[in-house]
């Protein structure tokens, strides 16, 4: 009673009966501090003080969806302002920091049914409004306004903050009194004509080129080309920040200081969902300010190489010990030590101790087997590259007039003894030969790349045989370099084949490592960054600019955009920037993003559909009798098997949902917002490819269903498949090295003699050939963070707000989607327990769970942290 009395006095009122002509409501707000790195469990009284300010500090005015005001241009009638009243003290579970307030509105039936609310913040600080719920609305019952938005003091805006009820309307179906509000809100978000620089409170979605990666004002070494806006270096667009150009180059945007993570994204795109998500930016900052000095302190007091595999294991079993106490003290001053402690557990003087990667948890040596090397092409962190070999020897797509002949040097003589009784021609006809081909990817860049300090990179081809038991075995690896007399002369190549004993077995291990270096770089640069993060951002921007929040397609896609603009902005600031962590740890170095631009020239939106991709790579063939319309040629291909059923579930959900609003193609063609959205995606967001003939015309519901399925697939399942296995597979870097620094040892050299002697000496040759000690520690410190699920993760088949729509048909369809995903979870667990499916676990005994939806984990208890499982809705890390 004392607490209630405090609130009564604070709000200047006592509890009183609800009067006639009033609508009761509850508003859920979150104070500013809770979504930062302060006290996550701020006290209730602090929450009231920070949110309420004074009793009229937050005002709500309802807008009628059915009654027009002739004196206000026919807009919906506006109700009188209502203010936050007493805070609801409840023992029910509310998220940390949430406060629930009562609100009472003067409203009668003559004003019709509320369809929007205008919110005004007269306080000094912003707050986060989650929802406003009205009960007992005449003629309607319950009305829910889902805001999920930061509301700043009113003097920051030149417009009113308007939120719509959770009803869904095509533009032609929008209640007339609300149409002006719908149009004005879209104009505000477009911000056309507002060049910036944009402020923290801004909500502007505009496009820009990738022109903010370099720092020409700091010298030529930090100059990077502008990506996007040209045929030479095309690229998807990113969100505009409005920052000024550099002094040296007017085409390059100036950058914030490295450790300033307040790079502009529209306010509601910023991490505001707390805990691990919001913590990510600070973790990256901790790496730069905390981990780098620790690593340098460590490597400066020891040789700059690991001395053995046990030396590497010490990262997980013993940790790094910092001998220089003063250096550690300085680090503690520069970064709040709690951050480093949370990021990297501290035990005594063991400052950096990393969790044991899944790939070596059960067996420390199984990663070295040929079986595991091949299996990871089907169930590893980059399972999207393997292709069926259709010609032997393998052909090149490089222009022979420029590059000469790059036909593979692998001959039948190299592999016939290992073909399990098959001839090459029989194996080709029987769909038994496959290839991991990075030759053409890297060859045009190798001259430049190998001039970078510390690099000796080959372009690789790996040929594999599909065995009778459904597993793959490598037959040969071809390593190639540009011809010393010029690229027009083709390549200088050497072929290596499997061996189990002697120096040949050591050479074979190195050959696999060189091939893995290629695959690691391609994975990070193309499979991960370009094909998920970069290509999705234009859809995020276009959706917010052209589709109202009440549009059915906006409601369908918005969960799959959560945090994407923010993580991409942080990537530009600290990861893919000039001399950033990516350039420090992966071999293409400063040419990395330029390479990804060349690859983007051949990107096709329609080929991102999983069934299309599998057929294109030759690992599946069309089959109209299959529910997925394709049949896999590698039956035990975990990524494809799980991916196809996930794809099917997404496509079915999207089809059922869109059918509610688009009963025929004519309705779709007449949807002006949808048509403007697709036009902008094609002509602006992916504008460098706008003239390609593969773009869907967006004339049919089928085209929209396929397009939305592709968008959701990329943002959820594809990203999960290539992201959350990073630390589990590559956290032990010998399994997935990112750099090779020395050529393959040749007979007569000291390195070759060490390989002949075997044992520790041979191990050292391997260790000193791959990623350096500094690069290893920095790289795996980063991917540990990037492989973690946040504590507030929202998985496929879940929504962060249960009241995301008022449409019962849509809610029922979504429930069916969730049920299908839970069935898929059980199916995946059953397959992982089937010993006949050898690729599901492999020699390392690591079940393939990267496409396990984790929809059933509503408490988020199973899915938090480094789990190597779960499909989040969006690219949020």
UniProtKB/Swiss-Prot annotation:
Q: List UniProt keywords, sorted A-Z.
A: Dioxygenase, Fatty acid biosynthesis, Fatty acid metabolism, Iron, Lipid biosynthesis, Lipid metabolism, Metal-binding, Oxidoreductase, Oxylipin biosynthesis
What is the similarity comment for this entry? Belongs to the lipoxygenase family.
GO process annotations (BP): fatty acid biosynthetic process; lipid oxidation; oxylipin biosynthetic process
| Annotated ranges, domain PLAT | 38-165
EC number(s) given by UniProt? 1.13.11.58
Which intervals hold domain Lipoxygenase? 168-877
Q: Which GO terms describe its molecular function?
A: linoleate 9S-lipoxygenase activity; metal ion binding; oxidoreductase activity, acting on single donors with incorporation of molecular oxygen, incorporation of two atoms of oxygen
What SUPFAM superfamilies does this protein's entry cite?
Lipase/lipooxygenase domain (PLAT/LH2 domain), Lipoxigenase
Q: Mention any Pfam family matching this sequence.
A: PLAT
Quote the function comment for this protein.
Answer: Plant lipoxygenase may be involved in a number of diverse aspects of plant physiology including growth and development, pest resistance, and senescence or responses to wounding. Catalyzes the hydroperoxidation of lipids containing a cis,cis-1,4-pentadiene structure.
For the ligand (Fe cation), the binding residues are 528, 533, 719, 723, 877
Q: How is the cofactor bound?
A: Binds 1 Fe cation per subunit. Iron is tightly bound.
Record's catalysed reaction(s) = (9Z,12Z)-octadecadienoate + O2 = (9S)-hydroperoxy-(10E,12Z)-octadecadienoate
PANTHER family named among the record's database cross-references: LIPOXYGENASE (PTHR11771)
Task: Record the organism.
Answer: Oryza sativa subsp. japonica
The cofactors named for this UniProt entry are: Fe cation
Q: Where is this region: Disordered?
A: 229-252
UniProt-recorded name of the protein: Probable linoleate 9S-lipoxygenase 4
Q: In which pathway does it act?
A: Lipid metabolism; oxylipin biosynthesis
